[in-house]
Structure formats: C-alpha cells, structure tokens
Amino acid sequence: YGAGGPSFVHAMINLADGTRPTLKVVSDQFGNPTSALAVARELREILKRPELVGTYHMTCEGEASWHEFALEIFERMGISQKVLPCATEEFPRPAPRPANSRLEKMMLLLSGLPPMPDWKDALGEFLAKEFKNRK
C-alpha cells in the first residue's frame, strides 16, 4: 500500500463511511502488510551496496490476516467500525488467493541490513502522512 491508493488501507477507510454497520473481512489468509515507503527505504539501502545481488523479498516484520490488518487500520484511525472475521469462501474473488502469502526474508537477513519496520509501525507512519488532514 502507498500514497494515493488504491489499496486495502484506502478501501477499508472508504468502506467505513457510516453506511455499513458491519464489515466482513477474511480472517484465514495471512501475509506481511508492507508499505511502499518501507520497501523504498530498504531498496535504497540495498542500492548503496553493489555487492548485494540476487532476489530479495522485502516485507515489514510481523504478520497479520486481512481481518487483523483491517482492525489495526480502524484502531489507528480512531474509526468505530464493527468488523467481523469471515472465511475465504464467504468472500469470493475473481482469482483464488493463497491462505499464506508470507514471504521469507533470508536474503535481507544474510545481507546484514537492519530489519524492516514492524508492519504496525509502518502502517501508523503511513496513516499519519496519508490522512493527516482527515478527522
């Protein structure tokens, strides 16, 4: 997710417009929520070191289901929105989604680069910048 959207973060905030008393969000698919800013910062560090070659998976630290991600978005935005967990089967998508999209970051660890930020911290930074004039 990044500035200007579209993204899951933007979609959740837009859906919490007061017209839906309850949202259902998938709770059985897990990943590493990662901001574009966190990836850009890590990429900048990699580019400073020409000896670092190969494929790098860059994700923020930690993991969450889409449901947990949505709850964190609303909590940090101070939005009172009821969010119920649901199974993937209850939320059909045009293309199947994996239950586990977490990425292994072994190349980053082996490179000696500092770890990327925790996903909750990166989300907080993003929300503070992207929605600074909202309230």
Q: Language-model segments: what does each one mean?
A:
Residues 64, 99-135:
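C-terminal amphipathic/interface module of NAD(P)-dependent oxidoreductases
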